[in-house]
Every structure is written in C-alpha cells, then in structure tokens.
C-alpha cells in the first residue's frame, strides 16, 4: 500500500528536510549531502527510500544523479498534495524544524551561487570564440523577439527545448508555457542551463539528457517543440525532425531557429557545424514530409550570416504513422 510506504518514508527528520529542499529546486545527490552536512552514501540511502515511496524521482545526467519531487499526473492532488501541506504546516508550527529548514535554505543559496559561478567561468573560457561567431549573426535580442512573435498568438503549452544549451530559450518561453523541458546531450550544458533556470518555480521546468535523434519521450508529449541553433550540428537533419514530429501532438507546433545557407567553411572547423545552413526549400520539403504545415519563414540578416525562423503546425493523424515508421526502421536496422 502506497500510503504506508509514504508514512514510513516521512518518519525521519533528514527525509523531511530533503522533501522541503526539493520543493525549491532539483538537486544532485552530492549537493543534498553538502546542504545536509551528511555523507553521500547516507544521503543516497534516504533518497532510495523517498524514491521507493513515490515521493521523489531520480534522473541521471552523465555521472551525476539528480533528485526532484515526483511529477506524475497525481502529484498535484491526493496523497502527494497532502504531504506537501503537512510539511508546510510542520515548518510553520514546529520551531526546531523551522530553524533547521531555514539553515538548509541558507546552504541552498550557496549551491545556487556556486552553480552561477561555474557558468560564469565557463563563459569566460569560451568568450572570445563565441564573440567572434556572435559578431556575424543578427543580434540575439532581435532573434528572440522574432521567435516570440512567430509563436503568437497560440498558447505554447508543454514545451520541449531540444538542444537547450545554456537554457536561454527555455527561460525566454517559460513564462508563456505550462511546463518546460530542456534537453541536451552535454552534461556541461545542462549544468549551465540549471544555473540559469534555478530561480524559476521548480515545478515549471525540468532538464533531461538525451540525443535529438532519439528523444526520450513518448509520442505526442508536447504542444511546442523548439530547435534553436541546433540542426546545423546534425549530419542528417531529417532524423531529429522526425523525432520532433513524433513527440509533438497533432495541432501542436515546431519552431526552428537556424542559419540560412552560407559558405563559411571555417564554421565546420572551429564550431563543429555539420551543415552550412539551410534553404527555405529544404525545410519546406522536410517539414511537409514529417506532417507539418510550414508558415512563411522570418529572415534576420546579420553581419555575414543570416538567421532564419521557421514555424510549422503539426497536422493531425500523423503520430501513429510516424511511430510505425520508426519501429519499422529499427527492425530493419
């Protein structure tokens, strides 16, 4: 019985503290150990009990294990909601528990600061090469404004930001989205994204590690899928586009921000670009083939490179066909 396992899981002061911390943000097990002042193996045992009870969930990101409050459909109501209210009341009424939670939050603030410092140091190391590339592009603020306008007036709903990188696009769209999932293959980039997003409500966003050619989500999981400056890293862009189509619900949308076709060969060498931009005709063909109805693209000239914004609506009754096609291709392989 789950009620029994939940009550057992909460019958420990450390696990109560962990649950209060997770109400504020997702934390690595090592970060929890740092906040709680306990060894990592000991904290891991507490984490296992909370996860077994269904109160918390683990998520692997490279060699790190992150913990968050359970985000199942039932977590906003019933037993999970009752637990949240109980912990809030306990902190209000129990002075000793309240003092301990306040101390934990002070340590949590140090974790936030450390994440932001790590992000700043990373950008400082790569600033010169990124500045050279940015100098060729249309200003970021102009591109972001064009993306926001291209997505209006339809609600964003559940958003998947594929190749989230630093998390800037997830941050930009979070206010208008019901929930944001930022996906990236790089643990380093996910740490940068976490530093950027950590001040948003913890139930508003999550991060996931994965590849854009094999998205770790079920069909029709999202209302909006964004690929911002991602597809030029794909040797065969139709593969990530097929995956984006699979996870986008009928009636949803895909938004692609990328470079127009160009001939700057140095981007292959310095920045690992597999494709030197794209033509409108390429995207018209790819998006149509994957069940989208493209709108007219937006063109944003820069100082040597042109940025394009392509938005397309997902046509109905294509998800099942795409799933069958994907399964058939796996069998053939």
Predicted feature locations:
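Class I SAM-dependent methyltransferase SAM/SAH-binding core
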Residues: 158-160, 165-214
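Conserved alpha-helix/loop element of class I SAM-dependent methyltransferases that forms part
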Residues: 138-157
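A short acidic, Gly/Pro-enriched loop at the edge of an enzyme's catalytic core
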Residues: 213-224
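A short glycine-rich, Lys/Arg-flanked "PGG" loop and its adjoining helix->strand segment in the class I
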Residues: 238-253
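Amphipathic alpha-helical dimerization/coiled-coil segments
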Residues: 2, 74-129
């Amino acid at each position: 019985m789950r009620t029994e396992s939940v009550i057992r899981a909460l019958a420990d002061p450390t696990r109560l503290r962990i649950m209060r911390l997770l109400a504020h943000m997702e934390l690595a097990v090592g970060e929890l150990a740092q906040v709680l002042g306990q060894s990592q193996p000991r904290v891991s045992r507490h984490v296992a009990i909370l996860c077994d009870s269904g109160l918390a969930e683990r998520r692997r990101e490279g060699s790190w294990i992150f913990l968050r409050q359970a985000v199942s459909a039932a977590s906003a109501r019933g037993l999970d909601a009752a637990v949240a209210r109980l912990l809030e009341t306990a902190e209000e009424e129990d002075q000793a528990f309240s003092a301990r939670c306040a101390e934990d939050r002070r340590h949590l603030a140090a974790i936030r600061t450390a994440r932001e410092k790590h992000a700043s140091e990373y950008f400082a190391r790569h600033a010169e090469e990124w500045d050279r590339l940015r100098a060729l592009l249309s200003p970021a603020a102009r591109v972001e404004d064009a993306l926001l306008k291209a997505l209006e007036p339809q609600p964003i709903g559940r958003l998947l930001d594929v190749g989230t990188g630093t998390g800037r696009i997830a941050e930009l769209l979070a206010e208008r989205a019901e929930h944001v999932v930022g996906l990236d293959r790089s643990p380093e980039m996910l740490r940068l994204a976490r530093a950027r997003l950590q001040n948003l409500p913890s139930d508003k966003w999550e991060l996931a590690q994965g590849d854009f050619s094999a998205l770790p989500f079920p069909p029709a999981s999202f209302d909006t899928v964004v690929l911002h400056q991602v597809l030029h890293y794909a040797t065969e862009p139709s593969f990530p586009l097929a995956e984006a189509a699979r996870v986008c619900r009928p009636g949803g949308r895909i938004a692609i921000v990328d470079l127009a076709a160009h001939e700057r060969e140095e981007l292959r060498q310095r920045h690992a670009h597999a494709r030197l931009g794209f033509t409108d005709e390429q995207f018209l063909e790819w998006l149509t083939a994957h069940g989208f109805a493209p709108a007219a693209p937006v063109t944003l000239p820069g100082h040597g490179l042109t940025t394009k914004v392509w938005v397309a609506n997902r046509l109905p009754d294509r998800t099942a066909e795409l799933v069958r096609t994907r399964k058939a291709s796996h069998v053939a392989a």
